[in-house]
């Protein structure tokens, strides 16, 4: 059984007890929440397609921990003007676990 859910601005294909990284959701570590938008679910070879989303299916998620993504470096310069600027960024992420998955 698997489902396609939308968390934040991204879509994820998830199964029972799967852990994945997502953008920061505003929840603290240890808190549980439901995926608000469920787009697709498959169970026992039956396919449920949302138009645009499923109302009967439910996916419960639990935030395990807050993590940071890989460092991204950037560099800007202007030739012959003695102007240069370096910057870096680390995306705030959360590790999330699928607690329960019900299709109907």
From Swiss-Prot:
GO terms for cellular component: cytoplasm; ribonucleoprotein complex; ribosome. InterPro entries: bL21-like, bL21-like_sf, Ribosomal_bL21. GO terms for biological process: translation. The keyword tRNA-binding does not apply. The keyword Ribosomal protein applies. GO terms for molecular function: rRNA binding; structural constituent of ribosome. Keywords: Ribonucleoprotein, Ribosomal protein, RNA-binding, rRNA-binding. Transmembrane segments: none annotated. It holds the Pfam family Ribosomal_L21p. Part of the 50S ribosomal subunit. Contacts protein L20. Belongs to the bacterial ribosomal protein bL21 family. This protein binds to 23S rRNA in the presence of protein L20. This is Large ribosomal subunit protein bL21. The gene is rplU.
